[in-house]
Amino acid sequence: MAASMCDVFSFCVGVADRARGSVEVRYVDSIKGKGLFATQLIRKGETIFIERPLVAAQFLWNALYQYRACDHCLRALEKAEENAQRLTGKPSQILPHPELCSVRKDLHQNCPHCQVMYCSAECRLAAAEQYHQILCPGPSHDPRHPLNKLQEAWRSVHYPPETASIMLMARMVATVKQAKDKDHWVRLFNHFCSRTANQEQAIVHKLLKGKFKDQLELLLGLFKEALYEEALSLWFTPEGFRSLFALVGTNGQGIGTSSLSQWVHACDALELTPQDREQLDTFIDQLYKDIEAATGEFLNCEGSGLFVLQSCCNHSCVPNAETSFPENNFVLHVTALEDIKPGEEICISYLDCCQRERSRHSRHKILRENYLFNCSCPKCLAEADDPNVTSEEEEEEDEEEGEPEDAELGDEMTDV
């Protein structure tokens, strides 16, 4: 059973009533599935809705490499200066205006049993109440613990740049296991789109690469050992486990947090003399050059989450709304990029800014590989007669990876 319309808004926060009054979820057609539509005029720059995820989890390699984040909400735990020191590889790196760092270490708390860290007592209690009682391994760091074996197996088959985590699936199961009203949570998770068997296989192949059938069988065995739940018995069959992978692979919204970026934004808001502004901007530019030289592109604490209302937003290469995480945790904001009229569909982009500037052929390649659909937004329709050309680098990637086999492609996005 799909989630009710009431359930769709149940994780909205802050302006939840505003969201109910300004948007609605409609069934579009058999290709697009659901979509989110404005019911009143939404002005450019307005926050359309703010939403918490059903579940979220930090990527496992990201956590292993000491990107320290709250185990529940993914808020960055390092002070901005500590963050800069680690990313530049310079223990003596000093930041000006340290008072602009928003990290409150005095509020941090850890689980008294397994010692995972939280940004606050509220997050520690929220995790314990929702899923952590099931997932807490206790004081033992025994690599033979079922959850430790599961995480190690995942890291061995899914390398950076990461796009999903087996622990997001684990938290889904643990949430249902701990819940008094199990049907409520199953209904919420069933809200996310379903795929055909061939589409699911293509998504699993994308996530696991290589001998994905053997890897999927290994992960399923460890998943059963660690988390089996009778109420979710279908998820523990080969077909159900593959469906769970496809759900997470196509519906997981990436989350990124950084105490350093928060500090930079605070610096941008300072009222300074032109000379001081130039000096500070030069310092920050050099800092990011040093970070790029030492660390490359991996700057943030990274993870993913499942958002019910946001998942109703379909894709467009010319979106009229965007997602962001301005609170430096897993709370998602959807903001209008232009005026949106009543009855108009609210679309976000699943591509980043650079990807959206690529050719139609390149955009479709990315969307097919990651979401199994061909876009028919106004930009793609306008470029339909353009030649199918792409860069030499992408052609080399095509030769190395190949296109997903047996994937059934939709003409448009389906509820991701």
Curated annotation (Swiss-Prot):
Catalyzed chemical reaction(s): L-lysyl-[protein] + 3 S-adenosyl-L-methionine = N(6),N(6),N(6)-trimethyl-L-lysyl-[protein] + 3 S-adenosyl-L-homocysteine + 3 H(+); L-lysyl(20)-[histone H4] + 3 S-adenosyl-L-methionine = N(6),N(6),N(6)-trimethyl-L-lysyl(20)-[histone H4] + 3 S-adenosyl-L-homocysteine + 3 H(+); L-lysyl(36)-[histone H3] + 3 S-adenosyl-L-methionine = N(6),N(6),N(6)-trimethyl-L-lysyl(36)-[histone H3] + 3 S-adenosyl-L-homocysteine + 3 H(+)
Knockout-associated phenotype: Mice develop normally and are fertile. Conditional deletion in the stomach inhibits malignant progression in a mouse model of gastric cancer.
Post-translational modification: Ubiquitinated and degradaed by the proteasome in response to mild hypothermia (32 degrees Celsius), relieving repression of the SP1 gene.
Claim: S-adenosyl-L-methionine is one of the keywords in the record: yes
Domain spans labelled SET: 21-351
Main location per the UniProt record: cytoplasm
Region (Disordered): 383-416
GO molecular-function term, one example from the UniProt record: histone H4K20 trimethyltransferase activity
Similarity comment: family membership: Belongs to the class V-like SAM-binding methyltransferase superfamily.
Protein name per the record: Protein-lysine N-trimethyltransferase SMYD5
